[in-house]
A protein has these predicted regions:
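Short low-complexity, flexible loop/linker segments enriched in glycine and/or proline
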Residues: 20-23, 125
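Acidic, His- and aromatic-enriched active-site or binding-groove loops in soluble protein domains
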Residues: 23-46, 53, 105, 131
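Short acidic alpha-helix initiation/capping motifs at coil-to-helix transition points
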Residues: 8-10, 36-40, 88-89
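Positively charged, Gly/Ser-enriched RNA/tRNA-binding surfaces
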Residues: 1-2, 47-178
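Short, conserved phosphate-binding/catalytic loop or strand-edge motifs used
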Residues: 9-17
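Class II aminoacyl-tRNA synthetase-like tRNA-binding/catalytic domains
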Residues: 1-4, 30
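Amphipathic alpha-helical segments within well-ordered protein domains
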Residues: 16-19, 33, 45, 78
């Protein structure tokens, strides 16, 4: 199997709570999500300036790209907000990190609070898995509690997709025989 991989975990509620705290309307949040998820920080900066988002929120929202990889960044992220939604998101990630350490897999995990999906139905944790030999994620997924309500079932859910073609290509490049 694969031995060289990395799973990146984000938390949509951190971003949503921060947007609420900053007073962003729904359309601005949607546009900003698109900019940040596409790593288009020039567009994000332009949008925040255009909408006259005040400090410290202007800087904090742009800083999402830097809140990546280590637990110190989670501590930094916690210190930047006052709202309960964002603080709870960080608490969930810290709890998850501790559990992953207990299982001995923390070395394969990074955190990225700037990892936002263009799909607005995600409500909490989002994740992507990468491996050597492929430039894009081979696994993508997250939590989407409200999506099933649209189909008549009000329940929490989490799901993911495995990009089989990319995974098989990675296995081939890594000379993993299956």
């Amino acid at each position: 199997g694969l031995t060289r991989f990395q799973v990146t975990i984000g938390e949509v509620d951190y971003f949503r709570g921060l947007c609420e705290e900053a007073g962003l309307d729904e359309n601005t949040e949607k546009e900003l999500r698109s900019c940040i998820s596409g790593k288009n920080f020039f567009a994000a900066q332009e949008l925040l300036e255009q909408k006259q988002i005040p400090e410290p929120y202007h800087s904090i929202l742009l800083k999402l790209a830097d809140m990546f990889e280590n637990i110190e960044s989670l501590e930094d992220a916690k210190s930047l907000v006052k709202n309960e939604r964002s603080l709870q998101a960080i608490a969930r990630l810290e709890k998850l990190r501790k559990r992953l350490e207990q299982y001995g897999v923390a070395e394969y995990i990074t955190f990225d609070l700037g990892m936002l999906s263009k799909y607005q139905y995600y409500t909490g944790v989002v994740f992507k898995a990468y491996t050597y030999g492929i430039g894009d994620a081979v696994v993508k997924g997250g939590r989407y509690d409200n999506l099933l309500r649209k189909f008549g079932k009000d329940t929490a859910a989490i799901g993911f997709v495995i990009v089989i073609d990319d995974l098989l290509e990675a296995l081939s490049r890594q000379k993993v025989v299956i």
